A protein has these predicted regions:
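GHKL/Histidine-kinase-like ATPase module
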Residues: 42, 72, 79-81, 87-223
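Surface-exposed beta-strand-to-loop junctions
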Residues: 56-58, 155, 239
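Flexible beta-alpha connector loops of hexameric P-loop NTPases
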Residues: 64, 162-165, 233
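Flexible helix-coil linker/hinge segments at domain or subdomain boundaries
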Residues: 231-245
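GHKL-type ATPase core
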Residues: 1-117
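Helical (often loop-to-helix) elements that flank the catalytic cores of nucleotide-handling enzymes
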Residues: 219-234
Length: 245
């Protein structure tokens, strides 16, 4: 969920935006803005050469019975984000105990490394296959690897958001992947004229894959963004997958 939901469920949310040489400040207390605007703009509280946004918030104990964060979920999300953005470094610090826990997440292999991590306890059949392309203003990248397992594990992301129920980008990937494999199988003579095509389940048996797209105007089903709904995402993913495979 986005900042509007976090704001509504927090005792306070404090924001500092570093942009165009200045630090701008905003603050909300139980969803109500407490910073006065200056000529319709957030006030400047300092100068800086940096860019970025710093957000501090405190979950509201009047809404939540428990306000302690689950560190494993926070770490997992940070690590996932590092895989999806190979040039990004994320620093995790937990200062709640007597000693600060400090972890640096940086994954220069990107989603190739993500697939390797997903398969680290499984027997793999080949090196990770990776490709990336752009069409219709949509960037598509995917990585996959087959294992000796009998199920598929395909994860879909749009703009770094995990789509637990998949969506159009996953549909495009699956459809074209099956089409290309069938065409290749017939070209090699593995499938004869009298043979039926492999099904999608046949082709993806044992596959681990990560499909990540960057979309300028994504549409999701539901507030939690579990499923991508853009038809152009299906076309873009299908075209890039078909061209690269």
């Amino acid at each position: 969920v986005g900042s509007s939901v976090v704001n509504a469920l927090s005792t306070y949310m404090d924001v500092e935006i570093s942009r165009d040489g200045y630090i701008h400040h905003d603050r909300y207390e139980r969803g109500v803005p407490v910073v006065e605007l200056e000529n319709g703009l957030l006030p400047k509280i300092g100068k800086t050469k940096k860019t970025g946004t710093k957000v501090n918030f405190l979950p509201d104990p009047e809404i939540f019975e428990k306000t302690r964060f689950k560190e494993d979920e926070v770490k997992s999300r940070m690590h996932e984000t590092a895989y999806l953005n190979p040039e990004l470094t994320i620093i995790y610090e937990d200062r709640r105990g007597e000693e600060t826990e400090h972890i640096v997440y940086h994954e220069p292999e990107g989603i190739k490394g993500f697939v390797k991590d997903l398969n680290k306890s499984t027997e793999v059949l080949h090196d990770v296959v990776y490709f990336k392309g752009e069409t219709e203003g949509i960037t598509v990248e995917a990585a996959f690897q087959y294992t000796n397992e009998f199920h598929e594990n395909i994860l879909g992301f749009c703009n770094n958001i995990f789509n637990a129920e998949g969506g159009t980008h996953i549909t495009g990937f699956k459809t074209v992947f099956t089409t290309v494999i069938n065409a290749y199988a017939r070209e090699l003579g593995i499938l004869k004229d009298k043979d039926a095509n492999f099904t999608g389940a046949d082709v993806r048996n044992g596959m681990t894959a990560v499909v990540s797209i960057k979309h300028p105007d994504p549409r999701f089903e539901g507030q939690t963004k579990t499923k991508l709904d853009n038809q152009d995402a299906s076309r873009a993913t299908a075209k890039v997958t078909g061209d690269e495979i």
